[in-house]
Amino acid sequence: MAYAYLFKYIIIGDTGVGKSCLLLQFTDKRFQPVHDLTIGVEFGARMITIDGKQIKLQIWDTAGQESFRSITRSYYRGAAGALLVYDITRRDTFNHLTTWLEDARQHSNSNMVIMLIGNKSDLESRREVKKEEGEAFAREHGLIFMETSAKTASNVEEAFINTAKEIYEKIQEGVFDINNEANGIKIGPQHGATNATHAGNQGGQQAGGGCC
Amino acid sequence: MNFLRGVMGGQSAGPQHTEAETIQKLCDRVASSTLLDDRRNAVRALKSLSKKYRLEVGIQAMEHLIHVLQTDRSDSEIIGYALDTLYNIISNDEEEEVDDVEGKRFEDLGSQFTEIFIKQQENVTLLLSLLEGKWRTSEFDFHVRWPGVKLLTSLLKQLGPQVQQIILVSPMGVSRLMDLLADSREVIRNDGVLLLQALTRSNGAIQKIVAFENAFERLLDIITEEGNSDGGIVVEDCLILLQNLLKNNNSNQNFFKEGSYIQRMKPWFEVGDENSGWSAQKVTNLHLMLQLVRVLVSPTNPPGATSSCQKAMFQCGLLQQLCTILMATGVPADILTETINTVSEVIRGCQVNQDYFASVNAPSNPPRPAIVVLLMSMVNERQPFVLRCAVLYCFQCFLYKNQKGQGEIVSTLLPSTIDAMGNSVSAGQLLCGGLFSTDSLSNWCAAVALAHALQENATQKEQLLRVQLATNIGNPPVSLLQQCTNILSQGDKINRRGSKIQTRVGLLMLLCTWLSNCPIAVTHFLHNSANVPFLTGQIAENLGEEEQLVQGLCALLLGISIYFNDNSLESYMKEKLKQLIEKRIGKENFIEKLGFISKHELYSRASQKPQPNFPSPEYMIFDHEFTKLVKELEGVITKAIYKSSEEDKKEEEVKKTLEQHDSIVTHYKNMIREQDLQLEELKQQVSTLKCQNEQLQTAVTQQVSQIQQHKDQYNLLKVQLGKENQHHGSQSDGAQMNGIQPEEIGRLREEIEELKSKQELLQSQLAEKDSLIENLVSELLQPSASAGDSEKVAELKEELATLKSQLNSQSVEITKLQTEKQELLQKTEAFAKSVPVQGEGETPAAANSTDVEGRLSALLQETKELKNEIKALSEERTAIKEQLDSSNSTIAILQNEKDKLELEITDSKKEQDDLLVLLADQDQKILSLKNKLKDLGHPVEEEDELESGDQEDEDDETEDGGKDQDQGYL
Ligand SMILES: Nc1nc2c(ncn2[C@@H]2O[C@H](COP(=O)(O)OP(=O)(O)OP(=O)(O)O)[C@@H](O)[C@H]2O)c(=O)[nH]1
Ligand SMILES: [Mg+2]
C-alpha cells in the first residue's frame, strides 16, 4: 500500500514475441513455454524500489493480434511507460516496429517512455535480428533498448526497472504533470512522509503481487 | 422495416390524418429551412409530438434529426431538442404504464429504431463526439450532454452488444465516456454511472478499459462522498457498476486488489449497533456491498486470486468488521443472512481467517463462540430457511481444508471434553441434537455439517467412532455410528416434520463420507450384523421413484463397504460381500441403482457451487462436497464390483509391496531428518561454546590486569611505608598504626591464601576439562559416535559454565581484596599525615620507636613476601590464560571435526539418495511388470492409481487450490 509513486505500463508488440511471458517472469518469476494467446488485455502488478522509493508498477499486457488492435489502443493514453517488444528470431516482428511506434506515438501522451525490447535472447542460434540493428532503431527513434529473455529471466528485471527509472527522472525534471492521472502516474498515499519509516515494513513485499 | 410498415398500415385508427401531415411538414421545415430559428422551432415541435406519436415521428423524422446533429452543432438548443426527440423515440422508459401487449410492441419499437439508428456506425460516433467535453464550462454543454447521455444509455439498453462493439472500435470511445464520472454536474455524473452500467454489461474488454481509466478510484470516491451505505441511489448505482466491472473478470479483480481498493471497502461495514437507520435504500446498498465482497472471494474464482483477496480482507480488518455485524443486534434478517454468506466465503479454505473466525465470540454473558451461536440457529426450526442455509454454508466454509477446525469440532463430542465443558452447550452437542431431532431439515443440516468435519480427514473419521450417546435411562450407551444406522433402518417409525427422504439422505451422505477412505469405520459399520441385510434389502426392493435416490445411496454405502474393506471381518470380507450382491441384488441391478444418484435432477445443480442455495426446503437434498465424493467413487466401485477375486488378490499384493517400499522410503526420510536435526544441534552447541570461551578469555585478561594493578599498589604502599620509616623513625605513638596494619595485612594474606587455593582448584578443573576435550576429540574422530558427541559437548559446556562461574566468584573476591587494599592505603596515608602533627605535640619515646622500627622492618619483610606471592599468582594467571587459549584452539579443532562429520553425514545422505533412486528403479520395474500384465489382458488401472498415489498427493493439493497455490500466486 505504501508506495511513493504508481506507474502504469503497457506492453505492446506482435503476437508471439513474448509479451505475456515477460510480464509473468517479472511478476511471478515463472516461464510459460506454451503460447497462451492473450485475449484483449491482462493485468499484472509488482512493487519495485528506485532511489530508495517504493514504486508500484501496474502493467497491462496487450494482445498482439491485429484483431484486438482497436481495444488495445484504448490503453495508450493512460500509460506512463510502454515496453515495445519484438522477437529477435523473427525479422517480421522487427519490421513491424515502425507501425507500432506510429500507433503508440499517435495515441499516447507525448511524454510516455518507450523501452524497445528484443526478446528471446536465449535463442542465439536462431537469431534473425542483430543486436546492433535493435540499438540503431532505438537510437534513431529516441527509445531505450535492451535484449531480454523471458525464458532465462535475463534482463527482464532491468527492462521494467530501467523504464521506471527513466519515468522517475522525468518526474524529477518536472516533465510529467504528476497531478494528472491521465499520464499514468499517481503519487502514493504517503508521498512526502519520511520514506525510511515505511520502507522497513515494506521490505518483504517487493516481489509478486503482495497486496497492501 | 417490414414490421414498421405493418404497424403503420394497421393503425388507421391511430393518429389523425392531420397529425401525420403536421409531422411531415415539420420534417420538411427541418430539412429545407435556411433559418436556424425556423429549424429550431420545427425540431422543438417534433419533440413535443414524439412521445404521443412515437412511431410516426420516428419513421419520418429520424434521418432529419440525425442530419441536425451533424450540421447544427454550433447551436446547443437545437441539438438538445434533436437528442431529446431521438431519446423519446428510442427509449421505452416512459411507457411503463402501458398494458402488456402494448408494452411488448413498444419494446420492439425501441429496438427497431435503435437498429435503424446504429445501422450507420457514424451515428454512434457522432453521438460520442457530442458527449466529449469540448464546451466544458458553458451551459451549451449541459443542453447537449445530458440528453446525449440518456440517448446513448437507451441505445445500449436496446441493443447492448452491437452498440458496445461500435463504441469499442471507435478511437478512445470508452475512455471518453469515462470522463462523465468527472463531470461537476451531479445529474450528468449520475446518469453517466447508468450509462457505464449499460456499457459494461457482460463485456470483458470494455470492463477492463473502464477499470484502466481509474473507474475504481472514481466510484469509490463517489461512494465515500455520498456517505457509504447511508448514501442514496447513486451509491446503489455505483455499486452495481462496480459489480459489473469485477464479476467474473479476473484481470479487473487482480487490479482491484493490487490497487489496495479492498482496504477502502472496510468503512462500508462500520454500520454501528444503533438500530436507528435501516432505510430500504441502506439495506439495498449494504446488500450490494456484501455481494461485491463475495465477488472478490467467490469459490469459483481462480484459487490463488481468492486466497490473496481473503488475506487482504483479514489484514485490513474487513473480516473483523463483518464479524461485528454478524454479532450485532437489530440487523435486518436479510442483511444478516447475506453477511453470514459473505463471512463464509471470506474464510473458506483460508487458515488465518478460519482461525480468526473460530476466536470470535458473541457478546453474550458468558461469551459464547460465534460458531456455537450460529449452529443454534441452524438447528432451530423457527429461524428463516435462508438463514439456516447460510449458517450451514458458514460452517462448511469454516471447516473447508481446515484440519484444525475439524479436530476442534469433533473433540467437543469426545467423552473427555464433554465432561470438561460443564454446562455450556458445545458445537458437537448442537450437531447431535440436530441429527436426532424431529425436524428433518435439522437432521439434514446437522448430518451434512458433521460430514464436513470429516472431509478428507482420516483422523477425525476414526475419532468420531469413539463417540457414545446416552440413550434412555437404564439402557447402555450407543455409538454415534450405531445410532445413525438405527435411525436409518427405523426411520419410518419416528414422526417427523418435513420430508422423510431428507433425513435419510442426510444420514446416508454422512455415513458414506465417514466410511470412505476409512477401513476401521467400515469394520465398525459391518460389525453390526443388521446393517448389511438392511442395505441389501433396500437396494433389492422394487420401490417407487421417490425411493430411488435412497436406494442409490444405499448402494453407494455398500460399495464403499466393499471398496474400503480391509478384510478384517471374517463374515464380511470383500469377496463375501460381492457374492452377496450377486446373489441378492445382481451386479447389473446394483450398478444401475448406484447410478440413480448422479442421475438425480438436483445432483448437477448441487455439484456446481459449494453454497447450499435452495429455493425451498424440499430442494435441500444434495451437498456439494458429497457430489464430489460420488464422482470420485462411482467409477471405482463399479470396477470393484466387476473385478474377480484373483485380480483383487493381485492388487492386494501389489499394494503391499508398494506399502513396503513406502515404509522403507519413509524410514530413510525420517533418518535423514533426524540426522539433520542432530547436526543442527551440534552446530549450535559449538557456536555457543565458542562464544563462552571468548567471554572467559576476556575475563582472564581483565583479572590479569587487575593483579598488575594490585602489584603496583603494593609497590606504592611499600615505598610510602619506607618513606614513613625515614621521616618518623622515632615515632612514639605508632601503636595505633601498628595495631591496625599487621592485622590488615594478616587478613590480606589469608585471603590471598584462599585465592591461591581456589586457583589451584581452578587449575585442576582446567586440567579435567582438558582431558575431557581430549576424550571428546578422540570420540569425534569416530563418526559413528555422533549421537554421543552431543552429550560430550554438553558436558564440556557444563564444565565451561562452572569454570566461568568460578572465575566470576574469583573476580568478585579480587574486587573485595582490592577495596580492602584501598582502605589499607588510605589508612596508611591518614597515618602518615597524622604522625607529624602528633610529633610536634609530644615527646618521642625511644623505646617505642625501636619497637616500631622492628615492626616496620617485619612489615616490610612481609610485604616483600606478599609481593612475591602476588607475582607467583600473576604467573599462575598467565598460565591459566595460556591453558584457556589452548583449550580454545582445541575447540576450534573440535569444530573442524564436526565439519568433517557434517560432510560425512552429507555423504551418507547421498548414499541414501542413491538408495532412493534404486527404490525408484524398483518401482519402475513394478510398473513395467504391471504393464506386461496389462498387455496380457489384465485390467490393472486401479493398481496404477494406487502406485502413483503417493507421488500424486502433492500435485493433487495444488489442483485443489490448497496452500501451495496460495503461495504460488503471491
Ligand atoms: N525461448 C524463448 N521463448 C520465449 C521467450 N519468451 C516467450 N517465449 C515463447 O514464445 C511464445 C509466445 O509467448 P507469449 O508471451 O505468449 O507471446 P505474446 O507476445 O504474449 O503473444 P500475444 O498474447 O498473442 O500477443 C510462447 O511459446 C513462449 O514460450 C523467450 O525469452 N525465450
Ligand atoms: Mg500475450
Swiss-Prot record, chain A:
Mind naming one GO cellular-component term on file for this protein?
endoplasmic reticulum membrane
Residue numbers of motif Switch 1? 37-42
- Modification after translation: Prenylated. Prenylation is required for association with cellular membranes.
Q: Where is the lipid attached (S-geranylgeranyl cysteine)?
A: 211-212
Motif interval(s): Switch 2: 63-72
Q: Which residues bind Mg(2+) per the record?
A: 20, 38, 61
Task: Give the modified residues of type N-acetylalanine.
Answer: 2
Gene Ontology biological process terms from the UniProt entry: autophagosome-lysosome fusion; Golgi organization; macroautophagy; protein transport
One Pfam family here:
Ras
Where does the record place the region Required for interaction with PRKCI?
2-19
**What membrane topology does this protein have?**
Lipid-anchor
Domain of life where this protein originates: Eukaryota
* Tissue expression remark: Brain and parietal cells.
How would you summarize its activity regulation? Regulated by guanine nucleotide exchange factors (GEFs) which promote the exchange of bound GDP for free GTP, GTPase activating proteins (GAPs) which increase the GTP hydrolysis activity, and GDP dissociation inhibitors (GDIs) which inhibit the dissociation of the nucleotide from the GTPase.
Cofactor(s) needed by this chain? Mg(2+)
The cross-references to SMART domains, in alphabetical order and at most eight, read:
RAB, RAN, RAS, RHO
Listed under catalytic activity are: GTP + H2O = GDP + phosphate + H(+)
Question: Which segments of the protein form a coiled coil according to its record?
Answer: none
**Residues annotated for GTP binding in this entry:** 16-21, 38, 64, 119-120, 122, 150-151
Q: Where in the cell is it found?
A: Endoplasmic reticulum-Golgi intermediate compartment membrane; Melanosome; Endoplasmic reticulum membrane; Golgi apparatus membrane
Note what the entry says on domains. Switch I, switch II and the interswitch regions are characteristic of Rab GTPases and mediate the interactions with Rab downstream effectors. The switch regions undergo conformational changes upon nucleotide binding which drives interaction with specific sets of effector proteins, with most effectors only binding to GTP-bound Rab.
Q: Which family does it belong to?
A: Belongs to the small GTPase superfamily. Rab family.
Describe the function of this protein.
The small GTPases Rab are key regulators of intracellular membrane trafficking, from the formation of transport vesicles to their fusion with membranes. Rabs cycle between active GTP-bound and inactive GDP-bound states. In their active state, drive transport of vesicular carriers from donor organelles to acceptor organelles to regulate the membrane traffic that maintains organelle identity and morphology.
Q: How does it assemble?
A: Interacts with PRKCI. Interacts with TRIP11. Interacts (in GTP-bound form) with GARIN1B. Interacts (GTP-bound) with HOPS complex component VPS39; interaction contributes to obtaining a functional HOPS complex that promotes autophagosome-lysosome membrane fusion driven by STX17-SNAP29-VAMP8. May interact with VPS41.
Name of the protein described by the UniProt record: Ras-related protein Rab-2A
List the source organism: Oryctolagus cuniculus (Rabbit)
